[in-house]
């Protein structure tokens, strides 16, 4: 099989520049480095393999051919076009060719729940949101939230299956004649607005955790003020789904710690201290901050255009 010596020249019309690159490998034809270049003239010559002393035998190196840089030394082959193939340019006007694929996300008719949550998010930005509702945007930081959920995971209430197994084991023990000794109820999380409200009013809750995305928000809008009045530390956690997983429910708005084991009292005290600093002690500051009142890009552009016209008119009057 004969080896190929490949040389290709690229000429730039304006600067009369010729780039010459020589290679002994035919694989250079498929090299991606050639793709960006246009007007490349390929010169491929089949040269017979030389002996042991030739250019490929490791002996003396043969002088490679050179490519002249003058304009008239080589000719450029014109692209051969078959006249039988006619050009049929597409017309994307109305009622003409099929339109190309475009991103039509803006025109999709989304499901009702998606439209509602998007409209709600826009309204919360456009309208002036009172402080009582705006306070639910100030959620617990990620590090403290992780520690809180880690502690709360230890005090998850039992599931239906666990309760069934516990009662079954107790019934079997009683049937065997070993006696029925009532056990003390372990400390667990208490969930639900009514339950937590009662615990706060009786000052039995040690820490109250409220979800930030309760819908309707009126269900829990009074809880921060009640907790502050009764001196109970409270915090606002991002995502009611995280609370739902803790207490094995489909929906959950708030949970409360009532009791913890002796080994976890130190961790709970640290959490309560950090949460009290961020929420209870800052209540007067939080209730003064309104939210929303952020205009959209169209309104901002319209106002800027009017201001520019007013400034131009004033400059004309002042002369």
UniProtKB/Swiss-Prot annotation:
Which positions bear N6-acetyllysine? Answer: 87, 150, 270
The entry's localization annotation reads: Cytoplasm
Subcellular location, principal: cytoplasm
Glycyl lysine isopeptide (Lys-Gly) (interchain with G-Cter in SUMO2) crosslink location in chain: 101, 150, 178, 298
Q: Which Gene3D superfamilies match?
A: 3.30.1330.30
Lineage, top-rank taxon, reads: Eukaryota
Q: GO CC: one term?
A: ribonucleoprotein complex
Report the GO molecular function annotations. Answer: RNA binding
The answer to whether keyword Cell membrane applies is no
Q: Does the keyword Ribonucleoprotein apply?
A: yes
Name the keywords, alphabetized. Acetylation, Cytoplasm, Isopeptide bond, Ribonucleoprotein, Ribosomal protein, Ubl conjugation
Role: Component of the large ribosomal subunit. The ribosome is a large ribonucleoprotein complex responsible for the synthesis of proteins in the cell.
Q: Which PANTHER family match?
A: RIBOSOMAL PROTEIN L7AE FAMILY MEMBER
Give the family, as the similarity comment puts it: Belongs to the eukaryotic ribosomal protein eL8 family.
Q: Give the multimer and partner information.
A: Component of the large ribosomal subunit. Interacts with CRY1. Interacts with DICER1, AGO2, TARBP2, MOV10 and EIF6; they form a large RNA-induced silencing complex (RISC).
What is the protein named?
A: Large ribosomal subunit protein eL8
